[in-house]
Amino acid sequence: MKTELKKFGTTLISRQNGREAFAAYRPQLSTLGDNETLELDFEGVITFSTSWGDEFLSPLVKQYGSRLVLSHTENLSVKATIELLEKINQLPFNRNIPTENKS
């Protein structure tokens, strides 16, 4: 299952907004298969705060572990926040680093 986080906005800030986004997203998780990957795509996200990420990503990485894959994390705000959340939670995020498209 792939979710584009920009559907929650391009500026993902505040603990309250992260909590509300997770509450709105949670029902969609019931359709995730037992062996299916959950991909969160950060393409288009401009600002990503630690408080929003803690409310949205932390419960997901604790529940899904390596099945949670983060893509398009090159933005400095996104990258720094993910690295900080890894230190706080002492859990690594699985990042899908895009490879060059050779058509």
What are the residue ranges of the model-derived segments?
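STAS-like cytosolic regulatory interaction modules
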Residues: 1-46, 59-103
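Residues at alpha-helix caps and immediate loop-helix transition turns in enzyme cores, especially N-
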Residues: 17, 52-53
